[in-house]
A protein has these predicted regions:
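Generic, well-ordered alpha-helical scaffold segments in large soluble proteins
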Residues: 38-42, 88, 92, 139, ...
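Glycine-rich cofactor/substrate-binding loops
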Residues: 2-31, 74-79, 297-417
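A helix-coil-helix interface module used to build multimeric assemblies
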Residues: 2-204, 210-230, 239, 291-294, ...
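Short amphipathic alpha-helical segments with heptad-repeat character
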Residues: 123-134, 141, 167, 171-174, ...
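Glycine-rich anion/phosphate-binding loop at the beta-strand->alpha-helix junction
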Residues: 180, 184, 244-338, 342
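A structural signal for small-residue-enriched, beta-sheet-centric alpha/beta enzyme cores
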Residues: 110, 211, 219, 228, ...
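Acidic-glycine-rich active-site phosphate/pyrophosphate-binding loop
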Residues: 9-11, 150, 228-244, 283-286, ...
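N-terminal alpha-helical segment
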Residues: 36, 289, 385-389
Length: 417
């Protein structure tokens, strides 16, 4: 069985190769290993574990050394992939010297590794998202400039409203994507933080240095907090203000940010679908031979990119609500809500990046029919400017009376005066 995201046929439509690599078993495991290597380095610097142990732990924290078949079997048995990875590291280091590998994973817990790996995966994902936002903004700026004086009819409740320019329509979208860029930059320092705090979030196993060849405090800070800082530095992450094992608001914020972002893409795609209708004919998706073709109606040019965008964005919004549900976790380690994230977060990221790539493609190659816009603007034979007539007459006969004159069908005559 395959899903639409990892399908050989649909995979590059509903995901991207870059995202598939980030959320793969191999990359997740690599980040587990990066955590263990970074932890060993930090603890050796502080005298918590022997330098020899740290050197060999780091040496064997290579994804190429992991037996993924054994990892799969052990994960099915244990329920989590972290302990099987740690067991493999310990076993390899113990071949160097008996018991030397037992220093691996010192003071850490399963969720420390899992959460930190997710943060690193999100960091990679949002780097790609940021690139897509920048490309979309650049394309929109070009459309705004090119069509700033191209008149068209605005639509209110799907009816012609008043004249606007197509450049103005694009400028509103540009403002939205610029706000999304700001949101992303504001999100990063809250999201890109380490999780390393031990079983219940207190760093209790290394809170006191009495059993280590290390001082109780380093640089005026408790040993556990200093270890946390060094590990964060190794991984290029921020230091958490406090443990967040069952405080999942930052991850939910990331998911809901992607929901907002892709919803803006879907707003544009919805407008484009309507503008591509045969009876409207104001804009079209980029032309590529056979793209959007019908199997039975050769004249059709379907808005296939817009359809993909709307479908993916709707799915992201639905799954983002599941990430909000995962916030409701019990005590200091949840029984169930945590696993929700494992299910939906990779899909949210895959669909979001694919959605943005489709959006970028549409903006960069958008076909605008200026004559079609002008033609539609003239359909009402001047009625589209009735608001301006009403406001002009309002100075003399009153705005409400002028409105009622137009409402009951006399604006056509007034426009001819």
């Amino acid at each position: 069985m395959t899903t639409i995201i990892d399908s050989h046929i649909f995979g590059n439509v509903f995901s991207t190769p870059e995202i598939a690599a980030i959320w793969s078993d191999k990359q997740r495991t690599k980040y587990f290993l990066d955590f263990e290597a970074g932890l060993a380095k930090a603890q050796a610097k502080l005298g918590i574990i022997p330098q020899k142990a740290a050197d060999h732990i780091v040496k064997h924290c290579r994804v190429e050394e992991i037996d993924f078949n054994d990892l799969r079997r052990q994960t099915e048995l244990i329920g989590y992939p972290v302990l099987p990875v740690v067991k493999q590291i310990v076993a390899k280091v113990n071949t160097v010297e008996a018991q030397l590998g037992e220093w691996a994973h010192w003071g850490a817990t399963t969720q420390d590794l899992t959460d930190t790996a997710v943060v690193l995966q999100l960091r990679d994902t949002l780097a790609l998202v940021g690139q897509s936002i920048d490309a979309i903004i650049n394309a929109l700026r070009g459309l705004c400039e090119r069509y700033k004086t191209t008149p068209m009819a605005a639509r209110s409740n799907l009816q012609q409203a008043v004249p606007i320019s197509f450049g103005f329509k694009m400028a509103r979208l540009l403002a939205s994507f610029e706000r999304h860029k700001q949101r992303l930059n504001e999100l990063k320092p809250r999201l890109f933080v380490l999780e390393f705090s031990g079983a219940a979030g207190t760093l209790a196993t290394i809170a006191s240095a009495s059993s280590y060849n290390a001082p109780d405090e380093v640089d005026g800070k408790p040993l556990g907090l200093r270890c946390q800082e060094l590990l964060a530095e190794e991984l290029g992450l921020g230091v958490p203000t406090i443990a967040w094992h069952t405080e999942r608001d930052n991850l939910a914020e990331a998911a809901n940010f992607l929901a907002l972002l892709t919803a803006t893409s879907a707003k544009f795609a919805t407008d484009l679908k309507l503008m591509m209708q045969s009876e409207v004919g104001e804009a079209r998706e980029p032309y590529v031979a056979h793209r959007g073709s019908s199997s039975t109606m050769p004249q059709k040019r379907n808005p296939i990119g817009s359809a993909y965008i709307c479908g993916m964005a709707a799915s992201v919004r639905g799954m983002a609500s599941s990430m909000t549900e995962a916030i409701v976790a019990d005590h200091e380690r949840s029984t169930g809500p945590w696993q929700i994230e494992w299910i939906v977060l990779p899909q949210i990221c895959a669909l979001s990046h694919a959605c943005l790539k489709q959006t970028q493609y549409l903006f960069e190659g958008l076909e605008v029919d200026e004559k079609g816009m002008q033609r539609n603007l003239e359909l009402s034979k001047g009625m589209v400017v009735s608001e301006a007539v009403m406001m002009g007459l309002g100075k003399t006969i009153g705005r409400q009376f002028a409105h009622d004159v137009g409402k009951y069908g006399h604006t056509y005559l007034l426009c001819r005066l």
